[in-house]
Design a protein with these regions (language model features):
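N-terminal signal peptide c-region/cleavage motif recognized by signal peptidases
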Residues: 19-21
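Soluble non-cytosolic domains of exported or imported proteins
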Residues: 55, 59, 63, 107, ...
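Bacterial N-terminal signal peptides that target proteins for export
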Residues: 1-10
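The canonical Cys-X-X-Cys-His
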Residues: 61, 65-75, 129, 144-148
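Axial heme c-ligation environment in periplasmic c-type cytochrome domains
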Residues: 25-32, 51, 80-89, 116-152, ...
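Gly/Gly-Pro-rich "capping" loops immediately C-terminal to redox-active cysteine motifs
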Residues: 60-62, 78-118, 128
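Electrostatic cytochrome c docking/interface patches
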Residues: 30-64
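Short, linear, compositionally biased motifs with a strong N-terminal bias
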Residues: 15-16
């Protein structure tokens, strides 16, 4: 039952992402992110954030976020209302008391996040979020997630 509620929350978040960011992507030119200082992850995409709490990744991710994501999601991930407030991305997980369920929730959110960033969000032919696959490498995507985890509204 709880898993079904989690899936519904993820779907609601995806719908909110699509509905609130119709004009969000604007004309941003994605910026390259230097990830040479990070452990390289290879070609196979990870299911979970391998850089969680990695200080170097958080620093790189913060810079990458401000260069590539802030125009829509707000400086330091504080949304101005155009696109979803990414500080709330893991809120559902934070409210869980059971550590096993919390861990599963965080894992599902990592998968959702990576998919949204890589493939973007399109509905009825309208782009709500541009895809970043091919622009941001895996290391950059996970470094941004590591940064976002430091900006959470509710700590895990």
């Amino acid at each position: 039952m709880r898993r079904q509620a989690l899936k519904q929350a993820v779907l609601a978040m995806a719908a909110a992402l699509a509905a609130t960011s119709a004009l969000a992507h604007g004309d941003v030119t994605p910026q390259a992110v230097d990830t040479k200082e990070l452990p390289q992850l290879g070609e196979q995409w990870r299911d979970q954030n391998p850089y969680r709490k990695n200080e170097k990744a958080i620093r790189i991710g913060g810079s990458a976020f401000n260069q590539n994501c802030a125009r829509c999601h707000g400086l330091e991930a504080v949304s101005g209302g155009i696109a979803p407030d990414l500080r709330k991305l893991d809120n559902e997980c934070a409210s869980l008391k059971d550590e096993k369920k919390k861990s599963a929730c965080v894992s599902e959110m990592d998968t959702f996040y990576a998919s949204a960033v890589r493939r973007g969000r399109t509905r009825n032919g309208a782009v709500y979020m541009p895809p970043f696959e091919g622009t941001l490498n895996q290391e950059a995507v996970w470094a941004i997630k590591a940064y976002l985890e430091t900006r959470r509204e509710k700590p895990l």
